[in-house]
């Protein structure tokens, strides 16, 4: 399933919220769970992981009205570690959460290029527009300015190009002649010359529609006798290679891309909790069920079983609630 179709599929939603919702008793339950000495973590999980994001925002308003406190700040003061990070992530409106993840990836020493690439390469034009709006409102600078200030070279160029959101034209029309020309241009920019014309790759990958790119990839393989992925791996390296490959992966199958991100967040020693939390939270009301299905096809195990083996405590319980049942 290509990435540009993923936002209209209700069967992909793993967190649908409560059908008989009333924010006031939920807010009271949360207040009691954090009142006095000790915290009832299970009560917090039972409320917040079983409500939609819109419902959580209403609970936060009720909490403020009833008890005069900010719910997110209260949660931060009562919880800690990975569990706190997950629960607080649930409280952000979706676009503000993704803006925060981008800001956090660039603040301080070093830049988490993988986070920026993941978000920019996998979102639609409308989503990127909302993320950019939230970013500027919350941090007082534009996302494009901060990316330009924090990255350089061809990586900066591909990230800024991705921000323009030119790939989600879903008209379905593909000009076969242009697709063939693009494939020939990519081949000429890489395999046929000593060195690589990176800007040709960036321009085609970031400005053509996803349906068009699928045809380009087919034509490219006929010309080069190798996949576009193999050519990118041989012609580029580092974060630029990662960015280009992510665009290709999301064009081919966005659910496979996110399944891969989740798998490698847990594979081997240690867990990339930031990747795990971000992708489960951000996809839970979009297409997480479809990602789960793809995960099982690709790795022969369920996402739930891998979470159970790789996490623990209330953190594990909350993640499993968000993921839902694996069939």
From Swiss-Prot:
Residues that span the membrane, as ranges: none
InterPro entries documented for this protein: Annexin, Annexin_repeat, Annexin_repeat_CS, Annexin_sf, ANX8
One biological process term in Gene Ontology: endosomal transport
Superkingdom of this protein's organism: Eukaryota
Name of this protein: Annexin A8
SMART domains: ANX
Pfam families for the chain: Annexin
Binding site for Ca(2+): 266, 268, 270, 310
UniProt keyword annotations, A-Z: Annexin, Blood coagulation, Calcium, Calcium/phospholipid-binding, Hemostasis, Metal-binding, Repeat
GO CC aspect terms: cytoplasm; cytosol; late endosome membrane; plasma membrane; sarcolemma; vesicle membrane
PANTHER family xref list: ANNEXIN (PTHR10502), ANNEXIN A8-RELATED (PTHR10502:SF133)
Record GO terms (molecular function): actin filament binding; calcium ion binding; calcium-dependent phospholipid binding; phosphatidylinositol-3,4,5-trisphosphate binding; phosphatidylinositol-3,4-bisphosphate binding; phosphatidylinositol-4,5-bisphosphate binding; phosphatidylserine binding
Annexin repeats, residue ranges: 21-92, 93-164, 177-249, 253-324
Purpose of the protein: This protein is an anticoagulant protein that acts as an indirect inhibitor of the thromboplastin-specific complex, which is involved in the blood coagulation cascade.
Protein family per UniProt: Belongs to the annexin family.
Domain-related comment: A pair of annexin repeats may form one binding site for calcium and phospholipid.
């Amino acid at each position: 399933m290509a990435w540009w179709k993923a936002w209209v599929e209700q069967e992909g939603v793993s967190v649908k919220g409560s059908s008989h919702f009333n924010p006031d008793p939920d807010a009271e339950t949360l207040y009691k769970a954090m009142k006095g000495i000790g915290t009832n973590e299970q009560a917090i999980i039972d409320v917040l992981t079983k409500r939609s994001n819109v419902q959580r925002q209403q609970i936060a308003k009720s909490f403020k009205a009833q008890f005069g406190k900010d719910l997110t700040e209260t949660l931060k003061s009562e919880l800690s570690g990975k569990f706190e990070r997950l629960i607080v992530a649930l409280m952000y409106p979706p676009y503000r959460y993704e803006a925060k993840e981008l800001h956090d990836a660039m603040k301080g020493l070093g830049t988490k290029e993988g986070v920026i690439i993941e978000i920019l390469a996998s979102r639609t034009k409308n989503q990127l527009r909302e993320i950019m709006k939230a970013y500027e409102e919350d941090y007082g600078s534009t996302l494009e300015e901060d990316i330009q200030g924090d990255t350089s070279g061809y990586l900066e160029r591909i990230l800024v190009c991705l921000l323009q959101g030119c790939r989600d034209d879903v008209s379905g029309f593909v000009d076969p002649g242009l697709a063939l020309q693009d494939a020939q241009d990519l081949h000429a920019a890489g395999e046929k010359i000593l060195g690589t014309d990176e800007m040709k790759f960036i321009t085609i990958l970031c400005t053509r529609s996803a349906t068009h790119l699928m045809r380009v990839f087919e034509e490219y393989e006929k010309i080069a006798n190798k996949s576009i992925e193999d050519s990118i791996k041989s012609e580029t390296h580092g974060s630029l290679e990662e960015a280009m490959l992510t665009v290709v992966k999301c064009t081919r199958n966005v659910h496979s891309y996110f399944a891969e991100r989740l798998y490698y967040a847990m594979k081997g020693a240690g867990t990339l909790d930031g990747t795990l939390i971000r992708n489960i939270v951000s996809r839970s009301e979009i297409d997480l069920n479809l990602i789960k299905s793809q995960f099982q096809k690709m790795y022969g195990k369920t996402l739930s079983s891998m979470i159970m083996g790789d996490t623990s405590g209330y953190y594990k319980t909350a993640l499993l609630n968000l993921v839902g049942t694996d069939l």
